[in-house]
């Protein structure tokens, strides 16, 4: 379950007016206040995939998600800033991702899943995962108690461990990211 995950607004730079003025610079023109004409231009730019002006405004978010989700997120971005909680500097709190249900691997398409496990197998899968999480976190704590540095103790933690980061991206990059995500849902 992703109940521990969140995405929250932190800050922004620029506005819709920044975007339309970035587009208008091509014609040595600028707008000082928002008009309906600006709204039409903004829509035109996006609808016709003239997206470079959207690079002139950005938004920062605080995100908490399992490490494997954050790594997939980072894989699909260009020109974005990313700062993540460091397991070198902080002790990681216990918290792991648990799937709502388990899917079967598609035998023909290595990138797909199909159907669901039986109820008995679902229960067994959850037990196996819980055992691994508990052991991994107990071992992490024991390594820290032994004096092992956090940088090395963290290697026993699974990628289902939750982490937090600040992500800043241009509005163009955010829209591209969201479109890619929608295409894979």
Predicted regions located by residue number:
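Family-specific signature for flavin-dependent thymidylate synthase
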Residues: 1-183
């Amino acid at each position: 379950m992703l109940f521990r995950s969140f995405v929250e607004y932190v800050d922004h730079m620029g506005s819709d007016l920044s975007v339309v003025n970035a587009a208008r610079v091509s014609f040595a023109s600028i707008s000082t206040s928002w008009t309906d004409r600006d709204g039409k231009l903004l829509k035109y730019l996006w609808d016709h995939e003239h997206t470079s002006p959207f690079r002139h405004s950005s938004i920062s978010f605080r995100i908490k998600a399992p490490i494997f989700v954050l790594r997939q997120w980072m894989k699909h971005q260009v020109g974005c800033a990313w700062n993540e909680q460091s397991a070198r500097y902080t002790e990681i709190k216990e918290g792991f991702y648990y799937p709502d249900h388990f899917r079967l691997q598609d035998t023909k398409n290595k990138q797909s899943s199909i159907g669901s496990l039986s109820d008995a197998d679902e229960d067994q899968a959850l037990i196996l995962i819980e055992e691994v999480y508990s052991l991994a976190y107990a071992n992490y704590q024991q390594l820290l108690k032994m004096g092992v540095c956090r940088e090395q103790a963290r290697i026993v933690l699974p990628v289902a461990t939750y982490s937090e980061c600040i992500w800043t991206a241009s509005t163009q990059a955010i829209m591209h990211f969201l479109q890619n995500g929608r295409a894979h849902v």
